[in-house]
A protein has these predicted regions:
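Acidic, proline/glycine-rich low-complexity intrinsically disordered segments
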Residues: 88-531, 536-543, 547, 553-556, ...
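Terminal, low-structured helical/coil segments at or just beyond the last alpha-helical repeat
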Residues: 639-666
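Amphipathic alpha-helical protein-interaction segments enriched in hydrophobic
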Residues: 518-522, 561-571, 597-613, 638
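C-terminal substrate/ligand-recognition segments
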Residues: 570-574, 655
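An N-terminal, helix-rich hydrophobic module
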Residues: 1-108, 210
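Phosphate/oxyanion-binding loops and surfaces in catalytic or ligand/nucleic-acid-binding neighborhoods
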Residues: 54-57, 64-71, 152, 206, ...
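C-terminal structured "cap/appendage" subdomains that terminate the fold
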Residues: 610-643, 647
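TPR/TPR-like (Sel1-like) alpha-helical repeat modules
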Residues: 545, 586-589, 625-631, 663
Length: 666
């Protein structure tokens, strides 16, 4: 054997082997850096490695047989006998094969199985235009790139809301990647001058802050969609994401050929502010302009329809608006039947307009398949699933929405509500705390956390702290002030400070509650209860009559609204009209049975129990309450102990047994 190793040394096989390994490794590393620049798949690297491994034993044999001399390549003279020479060549070949096989066994599977983290966040693009009002255009480019990427099911794409906090900041890419849970960051800038657009982008590896590639695009305004398409395809290729034919077609689709229509569209989309009706009305004008300039602009019609659905739900329930919004959704679908955003828009009209949750879910699921990375699609699906009583599925959908939008508190707020309805207050509080770590001033989160502290433990400290601090916040909108007053009144009623509650209710002018008929009716019932507690039955009755009048007027405008009938039932009950009150609340149940809506339906069921309780009918109220305590609802033992509406049956043995039974479980 020592003779074999001496021969290896004499024939310089060691030197060739080392040189081959070093050169092969350098070649593989160089290809790994260069190939992505030319959009060549990493699978080429694996092929090169395989060829190098196959070539290794061949190189050893050639090094054994031949030698490089000043006179050229010559056969190396052998000093061994024929049998020893054949044995040595066989041993050399076997050694080379074993080394290559062992290396390939460990290296190739890892190269093949190396899982690329196919996750990306697109940071806000910097506006380099001379006209700073063109910032909306940079936002529009970023938003459209995000939308294109969100159509690729093999990617994980973080939603726009979660990246907007990085606008105008010098990014620490590693920190952002860690915060958002992504491995790749796209950042860029936009400069617009007239109809010319220049877009500069850099794709960065968030794990090491290394630039993967950069590109500049200089195009006409009408060609901006080609930039977005090219970027989406390059990013998909870099992250080894598979593009289905449908996804490829969606990405390559140009929503409009009209540059002015596109500008109006992205301005309108950028104006969407859920709580600011004035901005929404400005956006309406811009959407109208976009569709006037291009009547075939399906995407604009779809977004316009979605916004109209939101306005209809929250600000203006006029039938004309519903007709307009539905027509826009249908128009978008006629123009482009496979447009995910059009199905999304139609889904919202089934949801907000018809309360047809099955039809809404069908449309949302179509939209989600076309926008597999859109957090709002999962949020909408989760909202429908909980109304269908599919709580496990709803939790999963909302968790997915949170993962795609990790710095937006709205999905977390919805997820926390789910957990609270299921009385999993520990999970609800973890979700709220996660949201407050992102936004310590998140109004809705603080409110829910305070409410849940009462629901779980009867603890008012968070609510009182929240309400006290809210009073010091400057420039609160009238709507938020009224909402705070409603919460303050509820706390005072639970604390049995009825006179204070009545004074608080009196401070809120009626015209401030015209869009909130439930609150308007509740205002007069609260004042009536305070008068009743003080022994002023005549005044109490007058306030209950006022509440009744508001509820009846509301029913005239919303005859199929369950909450309107429940409000009327409450007013009638306090007026002593038991049969009429039961008729109204049962009508509310017909309109919103729990079998149709497992999220809001339990509130109507609880209203029925309250009507029975007002008349001292524990035998009818307690079984209803027990059912609500056994399934997701807002009913908890602390709420039953605190709410004065149960006072008429509070000492009844059946009610006390219910409190004891479920209080022990809690």
């Amino acid at each position: 054997m020592s003779g074999f190793f001496e021969e290896l040394k004499r024939r310089k096989v060691y030197r060739v082997a080392i040189a081959y390994i070093v050169a092969g490794w350098a070649l593989a590393q160089g290809l790994a850096q260069v190939l992505p620049v030319f959009d060549i798949s990493n699978s080429v690297i694996r092929v090169v490695i395989a060829l190098l491994l196959i070539g290794f034993p061949v190189a050893l044999v050639l090094a054994w047989v031949f030698d490089f001399t000043p006179q050229g390549i010559k056969a190396t003279p052998s000093i061994a006998s024929g049998s020893h020479r054949r044995r040595n060549i066989f041993m050399l070949l076997a050694t080379g094969i074993v080394i290559s096989a062992a290396t390939g066994f460990f290296l190739l599977p890892r190269a093949a199985a190396r899982k690329i983290d196919k996750s990306i966040a697109v940071l806000p693009f910097e506006n380099l235009s001379d006209e700073k009002e063109n910032a909306y255009f940079a936002d529009g480019i970023q938003d459209d790139i995000l939308t294109n990427l969100s159509k690729i099911g093999d990617l994980k794409v973080i939603s726009r809301t979660s990246v907007m906090s990085y606008r105008g900041k010098t990014p620490n890419v590693r920190e952002i990647g860690k915060m958002l849970g992504v491995s790749t960051i796209l950042e860029g800038s936009v400069r617009r001058a007239g109809n010319r657009v220049r877009v500069n982008v850099q794709l960065i590896d968030a794990t090491n802050d290394q630039h993967v590639w950069a590109n500049d695009y200089d195009r006409d305004l009408t060609d901006v969609f080609a930039i977005q398409t090219d970027l989406a395809q390059k990013i998909a290729n870099e992250l080894q994401a598979k593009l289905s034919p449908t996804e490829k077609a969606q990405i390559e689709n140009k929503p409009t050929q009209n540059g002015e229509a596109y500008l109006a569209f992205i301005q309108a989309r950028n104006l969407f502010a859920p709580e600011e009706f004035d901005k929404l009305k400005q956006a309406e004008q811009l959407y109208d302009r976009a569709l006037q300039l291009d009547g075939n602009f399906a995407l604009a019609a779809a977004y316009y329809s979605q916004m109209e659905a939101w306005i209809y739900r929250n600000f203006d329930k006029q039938p004309e608006r519903a007709q307009k919004g539905r027509a826009l959704a249908q128009r978008a679908l006629q123009l482009q039947p496979d447009l995910p955003e059009a199905h999304w828009a139609l889904g919202y009209w089934y949801y907000y307009g018809d309360l047809n949750y099955d039809a809404a879910l069908k449309e949302f699921e179509i939209a989600q398949r076309g926008l597999p990375n859109n957090a709002d699609a999962y949020l909408a699906i989760g909202a429908i699933q909980r109304r269908q009583g599919k709580w496990v599925e709803s939790n999963a959908s909302l968790e997915k929405a949170v993962s795609l939008n990790p710095k937006d508190t709205w999905p977390m707020q919805n997820l926390g509500q789910n957990y609270a309805m299921q009385r999993n207050f520990a999970a609800a509080n973890r979700t709220y705390d996660r949201a407050l770590a992102i936004d310590p001033n998140a109004f809705g989160i603080k409110e829910l956390k305070a409410k849940d502290a009462i629901a779980e433990k009867g603890d008012f400290s968070l609510a009182q702290e929240f309400l006290a601090k809210a009073d010091t916040i400057p420039d609160l909108s009238a709507d938020i002030k009224n909402h705070l007053a409603e919460g303050r009144i509820q706390v005072l009623v639970f604390l049995r400070k009825f006179d204070e509650a009545a004074r608080e209710a009196t401070k809120v002018p009626d015209d401030a509650l015209t869009r909130y008929p439930n609150a308007l009716c509740g205002k007069y019932i609260t004042i009536g209860l305070a008068k009743k507690r003080s022994g002023d039955e005549a005044s109490a009755r007058q306030f209950f009559e006022n509440a009744r009048g508001f509820a009846e007027k509301d029913i005239q405008q919303r005859p199929n609204d369950a909450s309107a009938h429940a409000n009327l039932a409450g007013a009638l009950a306090w007026l002593g009209q038991k049969e009429a009150a039961l008729a109204e609340v049962k009508r509310a149940q017909e309109l919103m049975p729990e079998s149709k809506d497992a999220f809001d339906g339990p509130q109507i069921t609880e209203a029925l129990a309250q009507i029975y309780a007002i008349f001292g009918d524990a035998a009818s109220a307690v079984p209803i309450l027990e059912g609500l305590l056994q399934r997701p609802s807002q009913v908890t033992v602390p709420f039953l102990k605190l709410n004065p509406v149960w006072d008429s049956i509070r000492t009844d043995p059946q009610f006390q047994a219910l409190i004891d039974k479920y209080g022990a479980k809690a």
